[in-house]
Amino acid sequence: MNAIQDLTTKKSLDKITVDDLCNAAGYSRQTFYRHYTDKYDLVFSIYQQTLENRMEELDDYWDFDAHCKTMLACFSENRAFYKKAFTDSSFPSSFHDRFIEYSVRYTIEAIGKHKVNKDIQILIRCWVSNTISLVEQWTVKGMEKDEQWLVDMFRRLMPEEVKALYLN
């Protein structure tokens, strides 16, 4: 995983090939494809693993602000890497879309699948899409606002029906 982060300091994700990654990491293409479908899958896996490791550090109780700030810290600590993930021409929609799908699943699991009907799923997807767009803008434009401002915006964007299930 460090190989791709190191390579992105030298060239864009568009220009990095699976061969480049394998050479830098000392792995064969076969090993790479055993774990990842493509380089974009690797980038998202880095985010997902980093976030999940950080979330494990939180206490077992649910704290919306702490969970959001943990997610945002993943981006701020590796801003250059994630900025490229959001902006490189062949990758942004892939990372953005995977980020949305992961966050929708995470939100539904946090609420409890049995409490989420089709209408709530649509509201969650819309809310997640908006929050991901905010994270993307924040990452790409230099993180001018602090993390608490973003968390407050996430709350303001959340539909009341989702708040009732997610924040209580």
Each model region followed by its residue ranges:
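An amphipathic alpha-helix adjacent to DNA-recognition modules
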Residues: 1-5, 9, 14-18, 23-26, ...
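Hydrophobic recognition helices of helix-based DNA-binding modules
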Residues: 4, 46, 50, 54, ...
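Short, hydrophobic secondary-structure boundary micro-motifs
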Residues: 16-17, 83-85, 147
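Basic/polar phosphate-binding segments, predominantly the helix-turn-helix DNA-binding elements
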Residues: 21-43, 74-87, 93-108, 154-165
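Amphipathic alpha-helical packing segments from all-alpha helical-bundle domains
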Residues: 70, 90-133, 163
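C-terminal peripheral helix-coil segments that are non-catalytic and often amphipathic
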Residues: 137-168
